[in-house]
């Protein structure tokens, strides 16, 4: 098993398929990346040289926003929504559905998780009283 830009890939996978497992790279970007580097369509991960793997990582780092950068951006967007008290920010805080889904009979999993979270907090609050 090898890692390319933080994503695990099996040695028998094609480069195109393995690169789509990286957050931020879809099928079209994977094909573009392969063409820009001059890598064949059917080449597998274990057939790549160290130099080719380094080239792939450099190209991804230069041109694409991937994994930790995406996660950081998403978290910053959510924090911004919460800080300006937008409806979506409040729903994020509550753990409720954001996009108008029904909550009376649905979203049971989210409600269970909220309930479990409150149960964990109760004994701590009672201990401080």
UniProtKB/Swiss-Prot annotation:
SUPFAM superfamilies tied to this protein: S13-like H2TH domain
Swiss-Prot/TrEMBL keywords: Mitochondrion, Ribonucleoprotein, Ribosomal protein, RNA-binding, rRNA-binding
Entry's Gene Ontology BP terms: translation
Keyword 4Fe-4S: no
Region feature Disordered, mapped onto this chain: 92-129
Mitochondrion is among the record's keywords: yes
Chief subcellular location: mitochondrion
InterPro entries: Rbsml_uS13_C (IPR027437), Ribosomal_uS13 (IPR001892), Ribosomal_uS13-like_H2TH (IPR010979), Ribosomal_uS13_CS (IPR018269)
Basic and acidic residues composition-biased segments: 116-129
Subcellular location: Mitochondrion
Pfam name, any one: Ribosomal_S13
Entry's family note: Belongs to the universal ribosomal protein uS13 family.
Function: Located at the top of the head of the small subunit, it contacts several helices of the 18S rRNA.
Protein name: Small ribosomal subunit protein uS13m
Organism: Zea mays
Lineage of source species: Eukaryota, Viridiplantae, Streptophyta, Embryophyta, Tracheophyta
């Amino acid at each position: 098993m090898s890692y390319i830009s933080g994503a695990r890939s099996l040695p028998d996978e094609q480069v195109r398929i393995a690169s789509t497992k990286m957050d931020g790279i879809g099928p079209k970007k994977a094909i573009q990346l392969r063409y820009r580097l001059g890598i064949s369509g059917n080449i597998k991960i274990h057939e790549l040289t160290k130099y080719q793997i380094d080239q792939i990582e450099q190209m991804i780092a230069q041109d694409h926003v991937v994994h930790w950068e995406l996660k950081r951006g998403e978290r910053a967007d959510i924090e911004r929504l919460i800080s300006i008290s937008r409806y979506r920010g409040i729903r994020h805080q509550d753990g409720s559905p954001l996009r108008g889904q029904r909550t009376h009979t649905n979203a049971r999993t989210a409600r269970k998780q909220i309930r479990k979270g409150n149960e964990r907090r109760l004994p701590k609050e009672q201990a401080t009283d």
